[in-house]
């Protein structure tokens, strides 16, 4: 019996759930050459995205491939299951997150310089929900903490790396609001820091 390789890949992604499957592992499962595997994955990403009869999409996040629920379908299913979808980011958090993403890693004082307001409450919340993390200390006077975005940031915003961020013309201009719409997957640090600066 001939088995379609895309069906095998789909099943592997389904079983892996939220964790996804590393590209090397998935290639091994598919038994394809590197070139053929990359071509098949590009096809699957395109097909899942464009097919209106599919409720899922395939995405590459870092080195992993994962299945996600399409945003419009996610809302319907969430409503059916009684799951409330809520955007946890206010405008200040969005601006702080964007500054960190475009200037990573950066210190609290650097964020303050760009936003002209104390970023502490925003940082604490972003760390709590897992979008920002500490990245060591700066060599500047006082050795303040450095902050960077987390893998969850790339996951939620569908980015492979920082290079995939949209370009902005001038850092002084207000950074365009990012759309935070966490896709529910139906498969199955916070720390106190008052002495940063």
From Swiss-Prot:
Gene3D superfamilies: Winged helix-like DNA-binding domain superfamily/Winged helix DNA-binding domain. GO terms for biological process: cell division; chromosome separation; DNA replication. Keywords: Cell cycle, Cell division, Chromosome partition, Cytoplasm. The keyword Transcription regulation does not apply. Pfam families: SMC_ScpB (PF04079). The keyword Transferase does not apply. GO terms for cellular component: cytoplasm. Participates in chromosomal partition during cell division. May act via the formation of a condensin-like complex containing Smc and ScpA that pull DNA away from mid-cell into both cell halves. Belongs to the ScpB family. This is Segregation and condensation protein B. It comes from Malacoplasma penetrans (strain HF-2). The lineage of its organism: Bacteria, Bacillati, Mycoplasmatota, Mycoplasmoidales, Mycoplasmoidaceae.
